Amino acid sequence: METTLLFKTTLILTFELSIAFGLCIYFLKAAKKAALSGKDFFGIHFTQAVNMNNELDLIPDPTRSIEYPRKMSKLVDKPEYKWKNPKKKETEWSVVFAANREEAIAYLKDGYEDEMDMPKPLATTFSLWILSSFALLISSIVPPYEYYLLVGMFLFTFTNICLGPVLAWIMLMVDENDGIRALKITLIVTFLAGFIGYSDFYSFAQNEYLALVMFLLLLGLVVFSLVNLFRGFSRGVSRAVAIGGATLFSLYIIVDFNRLIYLEDLNINDWNTAFYMSYTIYLDIINLLLQILDAMSNS
């Protein structure tokens, strides 16, 4: 019996999200267990605190995981003889190495910054996630070939194995309790949006005007995020934009599930298409989760 495109897409999507979210929850639970026993986990030590809801809140404490000598740096003015333009002041990075904690504190007071914000095991995982995500993106948009599905699924799975710890780190930096709540909200919104999109009471995927508006809003969200890296907006503005971003990605989930009906009407029902659609919806869901986390962190 031939399965539907919806079944194939949902099967792949559920499998991959189970890996990412499952590992994320495992890392959060393991981090809590390690913190309660005074040990580190994945190269990270934690300080125990209590949030406003009287819940245990783990705060990553990278200073307890630092090895010496410790590289530190700060931006300083160049000597005048090094200026390329005699009339224009120039700067350069001054790098020092602290031999112990006392020296590191002294350098911090002098304006030097610690470059070791993320523990090495996590930094390695994050780098692998970036590389595999880029490779996955490329593999999903190239024309289908003999091993399209095999290569795509391998990269998809490896990417989510790396994403799990990264998501856990993001949640720990905010509040893992809010992170779990954001995860639950994401799953509920995804289910409702998928149901609305696949019920086909309106052809969202074929509305060109809606697609254009959503693309422009997405472009605006990207521009805002880039500007926010350098300028820094108020918490209220950031929260409002994050809520808008969550709404936008919820709409994308509706549109992409609605597109499945359109493809089925064209008698397109193969695993390559299911892989591509599952990856597209997956991106919507991950971005939805990140926007919800951003909104919670700025509340």
Protein language model features and the residues they cover:
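A hydrophobic alpha-helical transmembrane-helix feature that marks the membrane cores
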Residues: 1-299
